[in-house]
């Protein structure tokens, strides 16, 4: 029934869909593949729908909608950052938040920025590139730059968050597993009202 309903909605049935329906049936899940397929997070700048593809992604999106703080844990490439960014952009467009802040630790795997060539921006840009790529795909470079110039969307290394007051903001901390205990403590001291 699930696969037929998907087919009738114009979706191509893939091997992944079949495997997924079998897994849902085995789990006796109350959520169907059709329910997951109906969930819409937003659209890319090209008009392509952004939606969860798995039950785990649907639960993640639901948690972001319902909770103030959500931790997304999973292997690389499973859509954690992309879906969170799509949710942030939707919340921003619908005036649910006044600002989007995307941050990640700039120093990963013991690297030291001081030894890299160039100014500070050229040193941190490679660490922030995945965030920019997703932003450009979801909202377009022009819209991002316009909102960035107004201070409504910020992409910055985690170290720049020290001493901030972040009111009415959707904050995404990417690659949180690479934070130090001191950085996590600093995050707990950021004022959010």
Regions found by a protein language model. Give the residues of each.
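Conserved small/polar residues in nucleotide/adenosyl-binding loops
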Residues: 190-192
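Conserved P-loop
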Residues: 82-150
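Interdomain "pre-motor" coupling segment immediately N-terminal to P-loop NTPase/helicase cores
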Residues: 1-37
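Walker B catalytic acidic pair
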Residues: 175
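Conserved RecA-like ASCE ATPase "motif II neighborhood" in helicase/translocase motors
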Residues: 153-170, 180-184
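Pre-Walker A adenine-sensing motif
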Residues: 51, 55-65
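Conserved glycine(s) of the Walker
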Residues: 79
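Hydrophobic anchor at the beta1->P-loop junction of P-loop NTPases
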Residues: 72
């Amino acid at each position: 029934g699930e696969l037929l309903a998907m087919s009738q909605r114009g979706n191509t049935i893939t091997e992944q869909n079949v495997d997924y329906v079998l897994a849902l049936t085995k789990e006796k899940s109350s959520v169907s593949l059709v329910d997951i397929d109906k969930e819409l997070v937003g659209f890319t700048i090209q008009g392509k729908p952004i939606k969860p593809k798995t039950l785990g992604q649907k639960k993640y999106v639901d948690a972001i909608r319902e909770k103030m703080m959500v931790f997304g844990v999973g292997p690389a490439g499973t859509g954690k950052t992309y879906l969170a960014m799509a949710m942030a952009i939707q919340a921003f467009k619908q005036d649910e938040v006044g600002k989007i802040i995307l941050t990640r630790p700039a120093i990963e795997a013991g690297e030291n920025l001081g030894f890299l060539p160039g100014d500070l921006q050229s040193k941190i840009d490679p660490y922030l590139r995945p965030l920019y790529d997703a932003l450009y795909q979801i909202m377009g470079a022009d819209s991002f730059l316009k909102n960035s110039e107004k201070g409504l969307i910020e992409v910055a290394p985690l170290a720049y968050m020290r001493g901030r007051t972040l009111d009415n903001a959707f904050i995404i901390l990417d690659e949180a597993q690479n934070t130090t205990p001191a950085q996590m403590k600093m995050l707990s001291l950021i004022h959010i009202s």
